[in-house]
A protein has these predicted regions:
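Conserved functional hotspots at enzyme active or ligand-binding sites that engage polyanionic ligands
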Residues: 1-116
């Protein structure tokens, strides 16, 4: 298990098994759980990432990343899920501080949270 996972970091994770239209397989994910939860829990909260940007209809819960990965990709905040940290395979990189602020908005949209 990888230690010291932090919010905003990108990892390769094993999202198998999966069913239907849910993103699965070995793929990049963005850690969205807060750092306290990451420190003390054996699970973390992630958003899967896809590089199939031309086959996905762009919706308000999507966030495009054009750095840190091999190719331009989309973070799918409508598919946020909890995974065991044992499913995290390797570190890829980290979002910059500007993008970290933007993902809060995408998470709020996905969960139906109104701005306070």
């Amino acid at each position: 298990m990888i230690d010291n996972i932090c919010r905003g970091e990108l990892y390769i994770a094993d999202l198998n098994p999966y069913e239907g239209c849910v993103q699965g397989g070995i793929r990049p994910v963005l850690i969205v759980q807060n750092d306290k939860g990451n420190k003390f829990s054996t699970t973390t909260i992630v958003a899967p990432i896809t590089s199939n940007i031309y086959t996905k209809k762009h919706i308000p819960t999507h966030f495009t990343i054009d750095y840190a990965l091999d190719r331009k990709s989309i973070v799918l905040f409508e598919q946020i899920r909890v995974i065991d940290k044992n499913r995290i395979l390797r570190y890829i990189g980290k979002l910059n501080s500007k993008d970290l602020k933007n993902i809060d908005n995408k998470i709020a949209i996905s969960l139906g949270i109104e701005k306070v």
